[in-house]
Amino acid sequence: MKRFLSLFLSLILVVLFTVSFSQEIPTKIYNPKIQKVSQPLYVAIIWHNHQPLYYDPDQNINILPWVRMHAIKDYYDMAYILKNYPQVKANFNMVPSLLYQLELYTKKGIKDKYLILAEKPAEELTLEDKEFILRRFFDVNWDRIIKKFPRYWELLNKRGQSIDDVVIAKAIQNFTVQDFRDLQVWFNLAWFDPDFQEHDKELANLIKKGRNFTEEDKKLVIKKQYEIMSKIIPLYVELQKNKQIEVTTTHSFTLLCLFL
């Protein structure tokens, strides 16, 4: 993500520089008396960050984990990368339903079902817990992410690349307590942006370790997730105050801002 965004921003700067300083271009093919006068090219960079409202007030939990997962994968890192290019301005569409759920995690102590089961000690998992984990803790791109991590890929193949009831029932019997604990860790560890995986020493050490994780390892991964989530809103506020970004928003999801 960092390499892609850096390359994209560099390309924008090159285009702006080239267009701004280009000479007048004659258009003799159409009319030798008419010349095109080059004008600055104005480019609006808009990052659309949204999440539906997953919060269920009846259960007092977030039903799905995608606010948390994209927080550690995209929302912080994209703004942090932009901060390193102060001459580049951008717009971020941060919908209130996303900001609200970030605060549910960081200030209200609300969790999602995936997080609750990830935090649960592996030896205490029920059959229902194990079934859910085996079905849902591989919900990340298999080719680009899971395959990068040998143990995670091993666990996927041990489960089977299907969520058929027969396959899951067999996997429940075949998975050891350690297998379930490693899966709990890997699902949460693999979602981190590669910058965190490479440059955060504690996360890098866990990735290097690869298997036989402990409950303490799992707690560390979750702690890191909360640290990142708690920094997201302050970072965007800082960039907005410095006039490097503008924030556009609607409550939940919109395409209108992309058309303006």
Feature names for model-found ranges:
Residues 8-16:
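Bacterial N-terminal signal peptides
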Residues 18-29:
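Sec-dependent signal peptide cleavage junction
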Residues 30-90, 97-220, 241:
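N-terminal regions that are enriched for targeting/export leaders
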Residues 94-97, 251-253:
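Short, well-ordered beta-to-alpha junction loops that form the rim of enzyme active sites
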Residues 223-254:
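Structured, charged N-terminal subsegments at the starts of enzyme catalytic cores
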Residues 256-260:
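Alpha-helical scaffold elements lining the catalytic groove of polysaccharide deacetylases
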